[in-house]
């Protein structure tokens, strides 16, 4: 597990008592501000862009509604988001944290608003949705409507809390033990075993090992995010539930 993801997980664990000790209705807001602080510590450019885009999007949507320019703003803002994401990826040495998932969440909000499924969220609602710490690094790309309902209905639930903690532990085992330790050593052994074999077979076998490691790492990190959210009283949508059974891209994701 890379150091950056470990830092974010530790910060999210520290946020769990914060979310329950903060006065009612403000716990998730506190988690979002902590998420912004962690981003600022790791990657000031990421923090600056995400904070600015999160504040500007609802204001732009309201202005576009008043001017009756919804389609134009949706197209322009989507272009800005995608351009910023591509520019960040092409900038040498830049640490870009959670950029892909942030961009997808922003596009989801803009898309649902453009199609009339969503009224412009408040700046506060958009901040807590976009900067929710457990989902900041590896998703899932949950819907803002469901997230706001979860925030409103959030209550202490002992069973949900410990179920979330169990899922965090299972996710850590999947990502750290299986995805990193076991499969890294297996790859070394497989490479030694295939010395002298057909080059295509070597490349295929090692690539398969890498993909299996990626599966366990990403599945584990997703489980950690969902478990941490559950410990905060939030149930996020599943985004990695038996992907091998998917019949299309929507089922896969």
What is each stretch, according to the model?
Residues 1-252:
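Membrane-embedded transmembrane alpha-helical bundles that form the catalytic cores
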């Amino acid at each position: 597990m890379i150091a950056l993801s470990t830092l974010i997980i530790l910060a999210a664990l520290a946020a769990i008592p914060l979310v329950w000790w903060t006065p009612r209705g403000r716990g998730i807001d506190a988690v979002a501000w902590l998420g912004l602080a962690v981003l600022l510590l790791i990657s000031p450019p990421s923090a600056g862009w995400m904070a600015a885009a999160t504040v500007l999007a609802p204001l732009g949507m309201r202005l576009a509604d008043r001017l009756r320019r919804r389609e134009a703003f949706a197209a322009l803002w989507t272009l800005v988001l995608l351009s910023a994401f591509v520019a960040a990826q092409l900038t040498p040495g830049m640490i870009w944290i959670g950029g892909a998932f942030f961009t997808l969440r922003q596009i989801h909000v803009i898309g649902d608003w453009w199609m009339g499924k969503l009224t412009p969220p408040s700046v506060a609602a958009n901040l807590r949705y976009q900067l929710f710490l457990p989902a900041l690094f590896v998703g899932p790309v949950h819907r803002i409507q469901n997230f706001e309902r979860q925030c409103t209905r959030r209550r202490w639930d002992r069973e949900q809390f410990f179920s979330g903690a169990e899922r965090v532990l299972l996710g850590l085992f999947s990502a750290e033990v299986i995805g990193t330790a076991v499969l890294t050593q297996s790859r070394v052994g497989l490479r030694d075993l295939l010395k002298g074999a057909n080059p295509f077979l070597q490349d295929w076998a090692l690539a398969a090992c890498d993909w299996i490691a990626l599966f366990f790492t990403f599945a584990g990190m997703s489980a950690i995010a969902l478990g941490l959210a559950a410990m905060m009283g939030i149930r996020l949508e599943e985004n990695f539930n038996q992907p091998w059974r998917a019949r299309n891209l929507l089922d896969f994701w």
